[in-house]
């Protein structure tokens, strides 16, 4: 039976008044005596206390919490020989350094086909404990009383689960920033590692960090030129990716942002899932910093180790640009000086965003804010939906919006850009509409009676004569729905709006007075007053950007889009 199910099973048996007997065949291990050489923060002490109360369980906390140092304290307190399981050589090197620093012990290693284990505290790469190209587990030299699984969300993979279940250690703990899996297989993690014993919210983590958190949306004009033989619907996602990574205008935008970051004394990390993309950007950034380093995870273990050592040896006084694949830098990439992240390749999942953001979340002398440049390809529907999911992640992570063109807004208290949830946006959005003097442009994929009535009441009855009001919506798919849509369009037009129907429209966007942009996944004005949001609606988010430059650029692109296509 998976160890993580023991408590739940016992509770079930007790509630049924069923008798039971436990045969405990766990390994207690060999006693060790290592002193902990550091002092934990209050949050780390709370985490350690919970772990000591339980033989198994998970510490869930983001990068910068200090999961490694907390685990080192746990090793000292448990006083039993320990094996630490990691996924990569980069993580192995980090753990070697941490064990030496916090426990004053040089740990053994099992990696690259070489077993240099001590039987006291050892670190092993998961793949080194199984036969080549097989899930068959190799014979082990030592038995351990405690196993610590770093990045334990990987336990849901069969090979790692199979390995984790092969240990009979009395104590088994998992460490992760993202216990919830995109594929929904987190139960496997809990079966092998136990329940979550301690977790920190993003807001709690932010309090532990000595810097502010900002994301900067950069709206890209990337799109396909009209092609009578191909439509957006029958293009493959890979064809989009192939065109995106070689789009010169987009790459120039990214390169300029990176160069400006370096000029401002920042240290950027550029992440893409395509090596070809990184190589193109590397050429664009040649001589833009004292050190421009491309890390992809390719090469032998020795080559990768040498590359990391070179990166770690760069003095903090020297300018640095790092380009890396998301897979390589997503875990175990420890460069505390990094303060700027360029997300230059589209992705959707919030867990991936949390991992990538974590690369910036280590305290470092002189780091007072971290910035994430997110390149929003809003003209490609599939990429736009990916961005909408990332936006939800930024809000959960406690990030604030920042735009380059803040000068015009800086002196106005009510002009700050912000991320809103569905429950939060209504008051400020309706106030922006009610105060419109010059123009309102609204993109609504679907019209409802509530939206139509709200828009007429808030805007069309109050906006000054001569103001421009445009509403764009998606053409109804059926004749019945078209009839309903036409009736609502007629109401809007009779009230003074110009309405245009489009064959394709996915964006939910509002541009007010050519200076305020609302953009996200919220279906504006769709809910009646005193409406209780559904669980799905509660997930939706939108951003308010107070920037004439950004608002006018997006409006020009979106209004003119139909004419191009």
Give short role names for the model-derived ranges:
Residues 54-75:
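Walker A/P-loop
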Residues 61, 179, 348-372:
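Conserved SF2 helicase motif VI
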Residues 68-101, 273-278:
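Conserved Walker A/P-loop ATP-binding site and its immediately adjacent core
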Residues 93, 108-110, 114-117, 279-280, ...:
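Conserved helicase ATPase core of P-loop NTP-dependent helicases/translocases
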Residues 387-392, 396-413, 516-565:
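Signature of lipid phosphatidyltransferase scaffolds
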